[in-house]
Design a protein with these regions (language model features):
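Conserved active-site/ligand-binding neighborhood in enzyme cores
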Residues: 1-394
Length: 394
């Protein structure tokens, strides 16, 4: 059984890669890795069991987590911008509200005389129109309901495509400066300054036209996660500096799969899977459970056999962290970035009619432990029949 939780930060949260903060490194606080959420929830579970010395740490690794997910003030989920969405600005548009145009990239075919080194059977991802301008920077997270509506043919809200629509935690970062303390003398070490940058999920301060404070915004952001064990509501720690978050249960509505989407996926010839969290594969971008023909059974869903036909990838991400059990850094690994989209043709379907719900927020990663840690969580999206017919005609 899966339990859904909302995590409400009480202070800016610090997540980092291990590099020093500062303008020289350009390595500020970032959205947390799945392992950070999994570790926090497993620690909370052990404490709920009365294990304050982490004697059940190995047992806790068998508990599955999914997340993190960004929860917006509208009480809905936000997901990373999908890699198959190309946003362009029409400089000649008379109506500035319609200057930004979103184009859907799809599996297709090369033009005559063109080719590539793509693996046999993998189609290129193409843009229906020939863009003459550069892609635009947009918000890094989009509302899930708006994304799914766009998949079904509805227009995407133009205001949400602007970079100013970036969720508040990424715009309102808190930077604090600290000094290193000499443990022997109890005084600061001269010249030893360092900074900590955190993501601020709290209500931002409003500033009026004169530059004075005008109260606080009503927007409150949070994180969401799923866990395979029940947890007590209360304060837990998450990320660096032991920052606190309030763990709240009873938020199942946030993670429910829309019934219309489940029905569409159940009868579709194929499905597009977009990563909500980075994915870890043994063969780089290619899932290890696929054979040389790019076919394989989806991990954890017996009877669901798929064939990969195309993928739209963001730049790979370097993943590392701290191993609490071994007290040493974890080996660095390359991950497929969140937002990347894979198109699969459905070859065989499970006999269980509820299989689309099992696909919702499931993990696509290769290793069992990586899936338990929440790496490679996906949302299924509606794909057009033409996305697959062009690639299956030979």
């Amino acid at each position: 059984m899966t339990h859904d939780y909302q995590l409400n930060p009480t202070a800016p949260l610090v997540f980092r890669s291990g590099k020093p903060f500062g303008s020289s490194s350009q390595d500020g606080s970032r959205f947390p890795w799945p392992s950070a959420i999994a570790g926090a929830l497993r620690t909370a579970w052990m404490r709920d069991q009365g294990d304050v010395n982490f004697q059940r740490a190995q047992e806790s690794l068998e508990l599955a987590a999914a997340g993190p997910f960004l929860v917006g003030p509208e009480d809905c989920l936000y997901v990373p911008k999908p890699a198959d969405a190309l946003v362009l600005r029409d400089e000649d548009a008379k109506d500035t509200t319609k200057a930004l145009q979103i184009h859907r990239m799809r599996p297709g075919k090369f033009a005559d005389g063109c080719g590539s080194t793509l693996p046999q059977g993998l189609c290129p991802v193409v843009v229906p129109t020939d863009p003459v301008v550069k892609p635009q920077n947009t918000a890094s997270f989009w509302r899930l309901d708006q994304l799914l509506a766009w998949d079904s043919g509805q227009p995407f809200p133009a205001a949400q495509l602007e970079s100013i629509a970036e969720p508040a935690p990424f715009r309102h970062r808190q930077i604090s400066t600290h000094v290193q303390i000499d443990r022997k003398s109890g005084t600061s070490k001269e010249g030893q300054l360092f900074q900590i940058e955190g993501l601020d999920f709290g209500r931002a301060r409003n500033i009026d036209s004169n530059g004075f404070s005008a109260g606080f915004s009503s927007e409150q952001w949070a994180l969401g996660a799923r866990f395979s064990a029940p947890l007590d509501d209360g304060l837990i720690h998450l990320g660096g500096e032991r920052r606190g978050v309030w763990l709240q249960s009873g938020v199942n509505h946030l993670f429910a799969m829309p019934p219309a989407l489940a029905q569409a996926v159940s009868t579709a010839p194929g499905v597009a899977l977009t990563f909500c969290t980075p994915a870890l594969f043994s063969q780089g971008w290619k899932p290890g459970w696929l054979d040389n023909a790019l076919c394989g059974e989806f991990p954890g869903i017996s009877g669901l056999r798929l064939r990969l036909i195309a993928c739209a990838l963001e730049r790979w991400q370097g993943i590392s962290g701290w191993d609490l059990a071994r007290q040493q850094p974890k080996p660095a690994r390359k991950a497929v970035a969140a937002g990347s989209t894979y198109w699969f043709e459905i070859l065989e379907r499970p006999t269980d009619a509820q299989w689309p719900q099992a696909l919702w927020l499931a993990s696509l990663s290769d290793a069992t432990q990586d899936r338990r840690d929440g790496w490679g969580t996906v949302i299924p999206r509606i794909a057009q029949d033409t996305d697959f017919s062009l690639c299956t005609q030979g």
